[in-house]
């Protein structure tokens, strides 16, 4: 009887807590944040729903038309759409660039004016426009009384930096947040060379790695270590 009473009075073991989901990195373009399934509310992800366009040195997001010549500033353009984080890579289609309109070339001699005719401009006789005297180009006369005064160069004011202030590194391929007190000569992993976009090929000139897809380009690891720089050009 005492054994049955002890068994009845014993407390049941508490259920084991559910294992926490491992953090994952969002694969949406322009986000790159880490998240868990337990902490992924709607609106927590800010991203670009469509891919970039590259034409004549200009970088532009096809979804929101935001553009920049500088690649670091282009990547810093915030996403134009919000939603939930995801680990699925988006399928981006290459956006064709608009071909430049060809300017028709005038081949008829009758359409060429005397001011653009090569023979008239050189002072030779031209059967289409008659004899045209060569235009006299006025020569600029220097005024000896006008002496240019050189203004002394004003040095830029020195910027005061708080060692504990969070700053964002603008080195290409980094983009991390850091504090100046933790900065050192191996704190930053970045690409020193410019990005190369040519014939649908994307890559870095510094490490000579080139790929076709923009997602693969963003995953090229940096090739150089150095100091974080929040004022990089």
Swiss-Prot record:
| Signal sequence interval, chain numbering | none
Which residue ranges does the record annotate as region Disordered? 1-23
Q: Which residues bind Zn(2+) 4?
A: 191, 206-207, 223
The sequence motif named CCCH is recorded at 117-137
The residues listed in the UniProt record as binding Zn(2+) 2, with positions renumbered to this chain, are 48, 63-64, 80
Keywords, comma-separated and alphabetical? Cytoplasm, Metal-binding, Nucleus, Plant defense, Repeat, Zinc
InterPro entries, per database record: CHORD_dom (IPR007051), RAR1 (IPR043316)
Q: This protein's superkingdom? A: Eukaryota
GO terms, biological process: defense response to bacterium; defense response to fungus
The record's subcellular locations are: Cytoplasm; Nucleus
Q: Where is the composition biased (Low complexity)?
A: 1-13
Residues reported in the UniProt entry to bind Zn(2+) 3: 169, 174, 188, 228
> Quick one: a GO cellular component term?
nucleus
**Where do the CHORD domain residues begin and end?**
26-85, 169-228
Molecular function GO labels: Hsp90 protein binding; metal ion binding; small GTPase binding
Which Pfam families does the UniProt record give? Answer: CHORD
Binding of Zn(2+) 1, residues: 26, 31, 45, 85
Domain topic, free-text comment: The 2 cysteine and histidine-rich (CHORD) domains bind each 2 zinc ions, and the plant-specific 20 amino acid cysteine and histidine-containing motif (CCCH motif), located between the two CHORDs, binds 1 zinc ion.
Q: What does this protein do?
A: Involved in basal disease resistance to virulent strain of bacterial blight (X.oryzae) and compatible race of rice blast fungus (M.grisea). May act as positive regulator of basal defense. Associates with HSP90 and is essential for the pathogen-associated molecular pattern (PAMP)-triggered immune responses specifically enhanced by RAC1.
User: What is said about its interaction partners and assembly?
Assistant: Interacts (via CHORD2 domain) with SGT1 (via CS domain). Interacts with RAC1 and RACK1A.
Provide the protein name.
Cysteine and histidine-rich domain-containing protein RAR1
Gene source species? Oryza sativa subsp. japonica (Rice)
């Amino acid at each position: 009887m005492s054994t049955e009473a002890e068994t009845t009075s014993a407390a049941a073991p508490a259920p084991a807590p559910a294992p926490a989901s491992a953090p994952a990195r969002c694969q949406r373009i322009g986000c790159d944040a880490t998240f868990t399934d337990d902490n992924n509310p709607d609106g927590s992800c800010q991203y670009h729903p469509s891919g970039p366009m590259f034409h004549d040195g200009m970088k532009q997001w096809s979804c929101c038309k935001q553009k920049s010549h500088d690649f670091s500033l282009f990547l810093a353009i915030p996403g134009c759409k919000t939603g939930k984080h995801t680990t699925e890579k988006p399928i981006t289609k290459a956006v064709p660039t608009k071909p430049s309109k060809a300017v028709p070339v005038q081949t008829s001699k009758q359409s060429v004016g005397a001011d653009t005719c090569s023979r008239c401009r050189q002072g030779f006789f031209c059967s289409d426009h008659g004899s045209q005297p060569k235009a006299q180009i006025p020569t600029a006369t220097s005024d000896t009384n006008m002496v240019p005064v050189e203004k002394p160069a004003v040095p830029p004011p020195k910027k005061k930096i708080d060692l504990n202030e969070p700053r964002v590194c603008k080195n290409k391929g980094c983009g991390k947040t850091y504090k100046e007190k933790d900065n050192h000569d191996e704190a930053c992993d970045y690409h020193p060379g410019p990005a190369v976009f040519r014939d649908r090929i994307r890559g870095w000139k510094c490490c000579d790695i080139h790929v076709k897809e923009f997602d693969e380009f963003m995953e090229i690891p940096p090739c150089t270590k150095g100091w974080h720089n929040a004022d990089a050009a």
